[in-house]
């Protein structure tokens, strides 16, 4: 079913529910946490390209009163360490870089499920660097995650480069196929730009998917800038069921330009050792953009010619 979202101020809502499911504003965490289970579903530690230790992340999450999902790139040490703590609500997760360069978030009910998935299906296909693409295709990652009862979410589906699923590397048919396999899309990414988050929101509604939000934080100042919340118990299984059942709400605001620059500069230390992989992916993405642009020009010419033929045919018919 296609849902056409309406906009009211900074909020999107559907005609199915009166309450707003996507709100673009800084979360009032103290109010939200009094009524809902609130989680920042996208955060990185120093086990991949984040700046902070798990201890620092836990301390900040506890101060904000929210749950946290450490979703390091191609690594689970941070999520496993966080799961050992009893003072912070956390959801075990990982952000995997597929062979094609796009990212996939996967969440699990238990840390043991995450470990089993990682050791059995992901680790054998990892690259030499934590930020290097693994050798698994998007479809393979999703299928393996489902085998372990994981919840699959596509982060930042629209973004500047190839890391989102909605990019020219994938054909329209393949994008639709991948989206149909997933449980949700990240409609608010705190590190993204607003217009792409808007497109991601419309995508989530139109595909009738679960909606999530996360800061995509690499430093503590980003935590809680975008959150997902649900009326459920503070248990990973209950929260993930809410995503599956499309019973989550999202709220967040993108961080400012200077903070984006600060966050990006902090990631350089891990990306510096991954230049060859990044170069290859950027080359493929550039070629895909050129091909996509050529295809659009070609389609436009064909449409123009078809319209002209239709006009000529109509004129001939009128003369007769």
Task: List the predicted regions and their residue ranges.
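Charged catalytic cores and adjacent phosphate/nucleic-acid-binding surfaces used
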Residues: 1-39, 45-59, 64, 79-92, ...
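Short, conserved structural micro-motifs that define repeat-unit consensus positions
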Residues: 43-47, 149-152
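Active-site neighborhood of divalent metal-dependent phosphoester bond hydrolases
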Residues: 112-130
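Ser/Thr-glycine-rich phosphate-binding loops at phosphate-binding pockets of nucleotides
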Residues: 45-46, 68-75
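Short, ordered loop/turn segments at secondary-structure junctions
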Residues: 73-74, 95, 157, 217
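Divalent metal-binding pocket/active-site signature
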Residues: 124-170
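Active-site PLP-lysine loop of aminotransferase-like
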Residues: 96-97, 125
């Amino acid at each position: 079913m296609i849902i056409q979202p309406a906009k009211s101020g900074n909020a999107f809502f559907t005609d199915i529910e009166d309450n707003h499911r996507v709100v673009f504003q800084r979360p009032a965490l103290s109010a939200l946490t009094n009524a809902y289970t609130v989680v920042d579903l996208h955060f990185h530690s120093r086990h991949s390209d984040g700046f902070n230790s798990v201890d620092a992340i836990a301390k900040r999450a506890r101060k904000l009163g929210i749950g946290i999902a450490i979703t390091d790139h191609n690594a689970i040490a941070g999520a496993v360490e966080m799961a050992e703590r009893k003072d912070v609500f956390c959801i075990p997760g990982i952000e995997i870089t597929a062979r094609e360069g796009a990212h996939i978030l996967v969440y699990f009910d238990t840390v043991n499920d995450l470990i089993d998935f990682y050791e059995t299906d992901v680790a054998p296909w990892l690259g030499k660097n934590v930020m290097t693409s693994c050798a698994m295709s998007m479809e393979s990652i999703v299928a393996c995650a489902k085998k372990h009862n994981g919840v699959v979410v596509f982060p930042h589906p629209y973004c500047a480069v190839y890391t989102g699923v909605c990019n020219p590397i994938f054909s329209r048919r393949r994008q639709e196929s991948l989206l149909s396999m997933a449980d949700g899309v990240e409609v608010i990414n705190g590190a993204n730009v607003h217009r792409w988050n808007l497109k991601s929101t419309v995508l989530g509604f139109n595909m009738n998917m679960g909606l999530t939000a996360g800061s995509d934080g690499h430093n503590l100042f980003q935590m809680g800038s975008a959150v997902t919340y649900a009326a459920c118990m503070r248990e990973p299984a209950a929260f993930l069921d809410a995503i599956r059942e499309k019973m989550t709400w999202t709220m967040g605001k993108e961080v400012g330009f200077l903070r984006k620059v600060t966050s990006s500069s902090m990631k350089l230390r891990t990306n510096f050792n991954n230049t060859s992989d990044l170069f290859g992916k950027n080359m493929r993405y550039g070629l895909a953009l050129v091909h996509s642009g050529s295809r659009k020009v070609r389609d436009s010419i064909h449409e123009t010619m078809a319209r002209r033929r239709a006009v000529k045919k109509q004129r001939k018919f009128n003369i007769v």
